[in-house]
Amino acid sequence: MKTKFNIRFIFPALVITLLLAAAFIAPSKPVFYIIGDSTTRNSNRPQCGWGEVVGELFDTTKISISNQAMAGRSTRTFISEGRWDKVMSTIKAGDYFLVVFGHNEGSAPDTTKNGRRGVLKGIGEETKELTLKDGKIEVVHTYGWYLRKFVNDAKAKGAIPIIASMIPRNEFRDGKVMRANNDYGKWSAEVAAQTGAYFVDLNSITSDKYDKLGPDETKKLFPGDHTHTNIDGARINAASVTEGLRMLKDCHLKDFLLQK
């Protein structure tokens, strides 16, 4: 009788204890995933990508930053090398995802070292078949097609996608930084509108800052070439990203930003 009494009362108590414990377990933090090229992540010091410092502007006790960008990659090679599959294996509902490319896509798509990164221009459904050295066939798509894939795949996992226009280069013409309004920046905006992704016009926001700095001061942000910034330039671009996020009416990623 004593054994039956214990089982009868201890088992319900154990169930209640487990339920209470589960209720107090903190839910996992959302993750802010970032993919891009060397303007976002760059280990070749003194060069530095904005994704390496953007965590300074977020409350990382409430959100995690996962910078999956890789130098030298394009929208095409980020997928073909399996890097996108890696992101998709961990991204979950409620996470945020930002994609920013545009620097490595310009070569004509072929099987050469540079051509392997190239994509077709525009946002259409055009394709080009390439026979690789191992005999495999690769179907190359437009820049817009690759952006749509990123957005649609992220949405399918319940993540919130954001497209950003490419980081501007240190290229001035008539006293103004050359914008990407006629190609990769334009196509990024069009795909964002087409897919319902949020859009941050990073190219314009940072270009406006460079215009104010002028060519001489802007040059100080670019050690060695006209594409890759130092840490000061990276922080300018990171600030531009957060400024763009604050402009997005319904994107709650901005709720995780540290107050100005």
Each predicted region: which residue ranges?
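Short glycine-rich, polar/acidic loop-and-turn segments at beta strand-coil junctions
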Residues: 69-72, 103-105
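N-terminal post-signal-peptidase region of extra-cytosolic proteins
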Residues: 74-86
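Alpha-helical cap/lid subdomain in secreted, periplasmic
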Residues: 4-5, 83-231, 235, 239-258
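Bacterial Sec-dependent signal peptides at the C-terminal "C-region" and cleavage site
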Residues: 8-12, 16-29
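Short, solvent-exposed loop/turn segments at secondary-structure boundaries
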Residues: 44-46, 78-79, 174-179
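Serine-esterase "nucleophile elbow" of acetyl-processing enzymes
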Residues: 25-71, 85-97, 113-122
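Short, electropositive, low-hydrophobicity segments enriched in small/polar residues
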Residues: 40-42, 76, 106, 237
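Positively charged n-region of N-terminal signal peptides that target proteins for export
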Residues: 1-9
